[in-house]
C-alpha cells in the first residue's frame, strides 16, 4: 500500500508539472510525499531543500549575475566572433559564434546566456544585413538553442539538470561524481557535438551571400571595466579552486585531500563574499541584494524536489522498483542490456522534445533502474546517457526553457530548421551511445 500511495501522489504531480507549472506544484509534492508515510518530514526536507543542488544553484546564480552585470560575458562573446580569420568565411564565423557560446556556457547559467546571445544575434543580423526568414539568420538562432541544450548537460557549473542528475546518482546508486569527473565526460561530448552542429550546418548550407561583405573587425569589444576585470579574475580563481583539487589529489594526495573534500560550493561562496567586500568607486563590485532579487526561485525549488523524488521510488519499503521491473520486463524481453539502454535513450530523446527535460530525465532514470539493476551495465554511465538524451531538446517551441526565446518571436520556424535539427538530434543520440556511455563507464569507476 505504501508504494500505491507514493504513485498516487507522483503521477498527478508529473501531470501538473507538464500542464500547469513546476513551482507551487513541486511544493505540493513535498507535502503529499510526507502524507504518504514513505518518508519522514525530516528526510523530505533534508533530501530536497537541504540537498547540495539547492545551495549550489543559489550561489552560482549570484556569480552569474555578477558576470552578466559587469559585462564579462558580452565581451568574451564579442572577442570570439571578431577574429580576423572569420572575415569572408561564413562557416568559420558561425563556428566561432557557436564555439564562444559553448565555452562561455560551460561556466554560466544557460538560460541567462541564451538571453544574452539572442540579443547579440539580433544585433549581428542587423549589421550583416540578414533578416527573419533568411537561412543565415535562422542558422544563427537555432545554433544558440543547440549550444544551450549541450551546455545544460555538459557542465555541472551553474546548470541545474546536471546537479539534479548527480544528486540522483549519488542518492540512488551510491556513486559520487565530482565536477572534474563529470567534465571529463561533458567536455569531450561538447566537442563532439560542436562537430555535429557544424555537420548539420554543412548539410543545411544556408545562403551566406550577405555575410561576404561583412567586416568582423567591427565587432571588436571594448576593454573590460575595473569591476569586470575583478569579477573575471575572481571567477577564474573559483573555477580553478573547484577543478584543481580533483586533479591535484591524484598527483599530490596529501596536499589536495582537504580541498577536494570541501566540495564546490565553498569556493563559490568565498567568491561571492569577495565580490561584496571589494569596492570600486565606493560601491561593492557585487550588489548582493540586487543579485538575490534575480534568483530563479521556481527552478531552485523544482531542483530540490526532483532530488528527493527518486528516493521513495527505489526504496524497498515501497516496492515500486520491483513492480516497474516486472511490468516492463516483457516489453524489453529479448533485448540485450545495451539494447535496452539504446531504446530508453531514443524514447527519452523523443519525449524531451515535447515535454519537460528534467521530468523526462527523472522518469527514464527510474524506469531504467528498474529494468537494468541486475545487468552488467554501468548504471552511473546509463544515468549519464539518459541525462544527455533528455537534454537534447531543440525540435519544438516547448522543447526546453530557452526554446520560446528562439521560436516565439519568429526567429526560426519548426519547418524552416527541421532538416538541420533532425541531423543534430540523430548525431546527438549517436554521441550518447558512442561517446558518453564508454567515457562515463571509465571515468565514474
Language-model regions, residue ranges each:
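Short hydrophobic alpha-helical membrane-embedded segments
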Residues: 1-8, 89-96, 137-141, 230-234, ...
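Transmembrane alpha-helix interface/packing and boundary motifs in multi-pass membrane proteins
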Residues: 13-22, 100-109, 146-156, 346-358, ...
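Residues that define the loop-to-transmembrane-helix transition and helix capping
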Residues: 91-92, 138, 180, 265, ...
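Hydrophobic transmembrane alpha-helices of multi-pass small-molecule transporters
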Residues: 1-56, 181-326, 423-429, 433-445
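Membrane-embedded alpha-helical segments and adjacent helix-loop junctions characteristic
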Residues: 25-26, 30-31, 35-132, 285, ...
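Juxtamembrane and boundary regions of transmembrane helices in multi-pass small-molecule transporters
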Residues: 63-72, 131-146, 151-165, 169-233, ...
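Structural signature of hydrophobic alpha-helical transmembrane segments
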Residues: 1-7, 50-62, 111-114, 190-191, ...
Amino acid at each position: 500500500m505504501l508504494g500505491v500511495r507514493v504513485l498516487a501522489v507522483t503521477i498527478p504531480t508529473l501531470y501538473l508539472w507538464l500542464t500547469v507549472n513546476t513551482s507551487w506544484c513541486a511544493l505540493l509534492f513535498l507535502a503529499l510525499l510526507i502524507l504518504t508515510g514513505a518518508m519522514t518530514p525530516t528526510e523530505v526536507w533534508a533530501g530536497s531543500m537541504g540537498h547540495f543542488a539547492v545551495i549550489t544553484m543559489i550561489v552560482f546564480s549570484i556569480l552569474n549575475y555578477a558576470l552578466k552585470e559587469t559585462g564579462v560575458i558580452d565581451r568574451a562573446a564579442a572577442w570570439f566572433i571578431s577574429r580576423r580569420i572569420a572575415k569572408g568565411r561564413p562557416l568559420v564565423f558561425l563556428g566561432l559564434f557557436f564555439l564562444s557560446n559553448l565555452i562561455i556556457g560551460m561556466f554560466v547559467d544557460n538560460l541567462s546566456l541564451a538571453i544574452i546571445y539572442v540579443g547579440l544575434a539580433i544585433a549581428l543580423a542587423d549589421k550583416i544585413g540578414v533578416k527573419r526568414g533568411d537561412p543565415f539568420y535562422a542558422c544563427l538562432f537555432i545554433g544558440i538553442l543547440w549550444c544551450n541544450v549541450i551546455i545544460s548537460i555538459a557542465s555541472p557549473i551553474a546548470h541545474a539538470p546536471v546537479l539534479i542528475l548527480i544528486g540522483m546518482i549519488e542518492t540512488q546508486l551510491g556513486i559520487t561524481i565530482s565536477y572534474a569527473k563529470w567534465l571529463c565526460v561533458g567536455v569531450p561530448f561538447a566537442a563532439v557535438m560542436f562537430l555535429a552542429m557544424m555537420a548539420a550546418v554543412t548539410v543545411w548550407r544556408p545562403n551566406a551571400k550577405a555575410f561576404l561583405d561583412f567586416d568582423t573587425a567591427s565587432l571588436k569589444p571594448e576593454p573590460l571595466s575595473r569591476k569586470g576585470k575583478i569579477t573575471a579574475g575572481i571567477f577564474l580563481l573559483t573555477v580553478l579552486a573547484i577543478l584543481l583539487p580533483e586533479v591535484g589529489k591524484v598527483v599530490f594526495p596529501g596536499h589536495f585531500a582537504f580541498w577536494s573534500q570541501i566540495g564546490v560550493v565553498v569556493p563559490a561562496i568565498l567568491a561571492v563574499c569577495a565580490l561584496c567586500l571589494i569596492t570600486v568607486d565606493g560601491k561593492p563590485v557585487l550588489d548582493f541584494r540586487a543579485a538575490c532579487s534575480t534568483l530563479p526561485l521556481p527552478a531552485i525549488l523544482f531542483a530540490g524536489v526532483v532530488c528527493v523524488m527518486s528516493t521513495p521510488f527505489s526504496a524497498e519499503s515501497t516496492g515500486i522498483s520491483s513492480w516497474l521491473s516486472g511490468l516492463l520486463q516483457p516489453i524489453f524481453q529479448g533485448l540485450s542490456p545495451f539494447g535496452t539502454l539504446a531504446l530508453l535513450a531514443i524514447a527519452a530523446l523523443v519525449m524531451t522534445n515535447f515535454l519537460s527535460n528534467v521530468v523526462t530525465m527523472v522518469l527514464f532514470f527510474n524506469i531504467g533502474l528498474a529494468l537494468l539493476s541486475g545487468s552488467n551495465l554501468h548504471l552511473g554511465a546509463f544515468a549519464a546517457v539518459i541525462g544527455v538524451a533528455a537534454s537534447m531538446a531543440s525540435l519544438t517551441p516547448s522543447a526546453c526553457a530557452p526554446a520560446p526565446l528562439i521560436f516565439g518571436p519568429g526567429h526560426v520556424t519548426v519547418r524552416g530548421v527541421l532538416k538541420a535539427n533532425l541531423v543534430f538530434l540523430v548525431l546527438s543520440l549517436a554521441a550518447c551511445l558512442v561517446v558518453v556511455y564508454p567515457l562515463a563507464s571509465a571515468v565514474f569507476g
